[in-house]
């Protein structure tokens, strides 16, 4: 019997059909004799919709109240997925981030995990239940709800896998793995069978949307091997790990695009002490 952590993004649970598709994936894993912890994001564009609702009320809402609001998105997802699992005969229970034991610092909207108390998750697994956990959220020392920032559900999944010493951590997305470029934008890309943590971090920092860079950093720190898969097409994905055996030693593994980066060229700058400081000090 293996312990498997499975994470599903918002597009994987955006509607009824997708939720039942995820439920079948999870149930098949559990029915094969495995313990399963599932981490789920908010449905579809729920987080963006909640941000828009806040903007209708306040032009400058406090970070604490935003966390109270945004955390509700994942709670909808975990309850619906747990219902779907129970509906198809797979015993499941949903837990919020704080019920699952996530404790964080006080940096609202971009909190860092300080510890994970795994007793509740472990006790539910012992009862042969699938545990469905709300990603992206936790509780700080003031007992306030906090969120981990964009992509926080990936980080939640890796943290659970590390704390429970899981045998596998599977990240399900709407693509079939990590490609040499974004397959939704570039033709004839190639899926990578394996990629190192460092290579994945570089791609993530340059704008690749497959994995959140904080989750990869955490996976590297605790040596949690990741498997990136599609929730829509059951084919082998990409393994992200510390060392990759690559006989030919590819010089370039992938290409990513970041539209938020601009290049400014300044011509005819006088070669005088302090000139660069004056220019770049203003830009900074």
Predicted features and spans:
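Nucleotide/pyrophosphate-binding catalytic subdomain
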Residues: 1-216
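A broad, low-specificity signal marking well-ordered, structured residues that form hydrophobic/aromatic
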Residues: 131, 146, 226, 238, ...
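Active-site proximal loops enriched in glycine and acidic residues that flank catalytic Cys/His/Asp
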Residues: 173, 228-230, 268
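Acidic-aromatic/histidine active-site loop/patch
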Residues: 219
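A conserved regulatory-domain signal marking ACT and ACT-like small-molecule sensing domains
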Residues: 237-284
């Amino acid at each position: 019997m293996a312990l498997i952590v499975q994470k599903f993004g918002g597009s994987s649970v955006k509607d009824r059909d997708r939720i039942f598709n995820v439920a079948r994936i999870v149930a098949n894993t559990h029915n094969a004799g495995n313990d399963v912890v599932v981490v789920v994001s908010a449905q579809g564009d729920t987080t963006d919709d909640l941000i828009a609702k806040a903007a209708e009320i306040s032009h400058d809402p406090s970070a604490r109240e935003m966390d109270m609001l945004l955390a509700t998105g994942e709670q909808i997802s975990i309850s619906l997925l747990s219902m779907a699992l129970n509906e198809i005969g797979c015993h499941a229970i949903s837990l919020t981030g704080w019920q699952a034991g996530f404790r964080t610092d006080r940096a609202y909207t971009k909190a860092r995990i300080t510890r994970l108390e795994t007793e509740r998750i472990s006790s539910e697994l012992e009862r042969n239940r699938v545990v469905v956990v709300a990603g992206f959220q936790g509780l700080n020392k003031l007992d306030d709800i906090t969120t981990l920032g964009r992509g926080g559900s990936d980080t939640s999944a890796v943290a659970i896998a590390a704390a429970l010493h899981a045998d596998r951590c599977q990240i399900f997305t709407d693509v079939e793995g990590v490609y040499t470029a974004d397959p939704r934008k570039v033709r004839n890309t190639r899926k990578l069978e394996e990629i190192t943590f460092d290579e994945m971090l570089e791609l993530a920092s340059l704008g690749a949307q497959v994995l959140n860079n904080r989750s990869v950093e955490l996976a590297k720190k605790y040596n949690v091997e990741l498997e990136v898969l599609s929730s829509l097409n059951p084919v082998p994905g990409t393994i992200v790990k510390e060392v990759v055996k690559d006989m030919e030693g590819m010089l370039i593994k992938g290409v990513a695009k970041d539209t938020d980066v601009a290049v400014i060229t300044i011509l005819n700058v006088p070669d005088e002490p302090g000139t660069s400081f004056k220019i770049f000090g203003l830009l900074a």
